[in-house]
Amino acid sequence: MKALAKLERAPGLTLTDVKKPEVGHNDVMIRITRTAICGTDIHIWKWDDWAQKTIPVPMHVGHEYVGEIVEMGQEVRGFAIGDRVSGEGHITCGFCRNCRAGRRHLCRNTVGVGVNREGAFAEYLVIPAFNAFKIPPEISDDLAAIFDPFGNATHTALSFNLVGEDVLITGAGPIGIMAVAIAKHVGARNVVITDVNDYRLELARKMGATRAVNVSRESLRDVMADLHMTEGFDVGLEMSGVPSAFTSMLEAMNHGGKIALLGIPPAQTAIDWTQVIFKGLEIKGIYGREMFETWYKMVAMLQSGLDLSPILTHHFKVDDYQEAFATMLSGESGKVILDWTAA
């Protein structure tokens, strides 16, 4: 089958032929129709330090996808041939304390699809049936293909009550932009997002941001004054991993504020801990999606009017993958979709 693979320890990916995967007793085989390019895939493409330490070579990658079940293991229940599915990219052990307590998103033995094992940038993907998630007919393939990052945004944004709250989002990547739409959808008052990328800040405006702030030109404090915010933000969603962004968030938070951290800062990042302690801030780390509460929340929000269509900015056939990755690397895109139906 055709697949996008890392064949050598160097930048880039190669469209190549690989062996079709085999289906185990508890697995489903999915014929892939759409995939999306993730920031993780960009790290793999660039072959940065993280990728060099993490990604087996050779291996085909990718973990944002939708497709149709074409084969099932003999023990699989609850699915049928022809079901349209996406899937949870974190394969958990099922036996550690957190798994057995129902907190599978906190499994200490997680294996990542397209990171630690063969991925979805291929004509076919095999995953445990437990990880598959049925997609309702009213949700398009393009939207279903981005359920993985949409889930990151949902898990982060819904970590705290947002109704009537003032929310600061630092980092206008696709996940941060989707978090804007989620926060507004569930009833936040002011949703302010910061970045230095004008293209993506404009996308955030289209997704409902109260203010989209280019911090290279505009002061967050001035924006807060314009919005008559006298006490600071109630909730912070840190999506960038940029230390200066986190610092500005800590300074802008109200006492008793709550922060969810999805962005990954450098290992030795220093912050002013007095901001955390004397303000009584609550900080929560976010990894992946809650299984499967986050997935049900995603579907419910889309069915109740959440519009993510502005984030779907570019579409390519898989044969044009190099142009697709170049578009993502340019910084002037939202989500980039690859069509596998012509593969």
Curated annotation (Swiss-Prot):
PROSITE patterns: ADH_ZINC
Cofactor list: Zn(2+)
Reactions accelerated catalytically: L-threonine + NAD(+) = (2S)-2-amino-3-oxobutanoate + NADH + H(+)
Source domain of life: Bacteria
Pfam families: ADH_N, ADH_zinc_N
Annotated NAD(+) binding sites: 175, 195, 200, 262-264, 286-287
Gene Ontology biological-process entries: L-threonine catabolic process to glycine
InterPro entries cross-referenced by the UniProt entry: ADH-like_C, ADH-like_N, ADH_Zn_CS, GroES-like_sf, L-Threonine_3-DHase, NAD(P)-bd_dom_sf, PKS_ER, Zn_alcohol_dh
Active-site residues, as the UniProt record annotates them: 40 (charge relay system), 43 (charge relay system)
Database matches in SMART domains: PKS_ER
UniProt subunit comment: Homotetramer.
Name of this chain's protein: L-threonine 3-dehydrogenase
Lineage: Bacteria, Pseudomonadati, Pseudomonadota, Betaproteobacteria, Burkholderiales
